[in-house]
Curated annotation (Swiss-Prot):
The gene is nhr-28. Residues 91-104 have a biased composition (Polar residues). This is Nuclear hormone receptor family member nhr-28. It comes from the Eukaryota. Orphan nuclear receptor. It comes from Caenorhabditis briggsae.
Amino acid sequence: MIIGKKPCSVCGEAGDGAHFGAEACRACAAFFRRSVALNKAYVCRAMGACIIQKNVRCMCRACRFSKCMSVGMRKSAVQRHRELFGRQDSSDGSNPRVSPSTSWPMDVSPVNIEEPGMATLNCLNENYTHMSNVRRVIHNTGSGNIFNPREPKAVAYTDAHSVHLKEIGLVADWIIKSYPDFQKVHQEQKKLLYRNFFLPFMILECGYHCCLNDRTDILFLPSGDFIDCSRPETFYGSHINSHLMSPEEAIRMFVPSFEIYRRNVLDPMRREKVDNYEFFTLCSLVLWDHGLEGQIDECVNMARHNRERILREILYYYRRVKQIPDPSMRLANLLVLLPALQRSVRRFQEDVEITHVFNVYSVEETFYELVSGRLSDGFFQKATQLDATPEEMKEIKKEVECVWDLNTSQVVDLYDLPPTSFLTPTSSTPSSTEM
């Protein structure tokens, strides 16, 4: 009697026998062997709750590897197999491998879902990965390899505004590449949508990184540095250059804003454990807003079409991938975040306006205009050109193309890169600001 092979204990596909201590298919066995042999360190963007099945097994490598371990696969079996072919350099004392605990910039597993129900969300995810790698170069103010680990630092307002100024064009590039319909919109309508989007995105992304790192006492910046909310003097301090307001008065006036951001955005996102696809959904709903002053009917209709599409995709994600028992309630809890986000945006706008009126500290004109609802006429002619010197552009080309195939617009195995170059500040890390 012929006995059929058992299914893979990781993904449920037809098995190929016992591998490393558990029943597994060839794909999962090869994945486990490669992960252990190359000492891979994966990070899940969905709080370790991804479903691993044969049609979505490649979606999250972190959860796939965790499941390999939970079903009984042994790292030691891979190690013994490797030693048959030559002893590895096991000198732990020399050149230790740094394992960063932060989730930013994120090492993202390329999405490979066979069912075509999340086209826009997948596109956003891939382009966000690309943007994260470009950020490593754009915001690299030091010397040496951009993938070498560096300790994040608490920054002052001048550094934070410099980061956000670089982000204006970079985020616009992400939007243009991710939404084909955005290119079809009239120039003035593009500016209208984007200036309504950038500040909410900036705050949303900060909440998303706080959610990933499970802490809300600091505000993560796209550069990998942070604003230390518990020590506002590192952000304002003695750098206030105003005759109308002392540094102490500035701290008393603006520190309550940190509490507003935390209460309205950071804590709710952390409580709901918002993952990457939910973050992209919120971004999409903010971008494709309607009822804006000056918005024409054609733009309104296109915005409605894109909102409906992204809502269908997130519901598909809830039902088919996450397999949430009550997708409607989960989506409702997600949408409740949007009014609170707008309260934080208004507070940020008020703070910037106060600093401008009282000349508390200088704000770059481009950033102030965006906060005030203005963009230059030629913004989208130059937005896709990254704000970088020719030398930086060469570095971007050298470092980024190794993980992004410009011909196919697909991620090329990000996990062949060294570990991410940023470390999460710990409670014991002194919050020093480099000036």
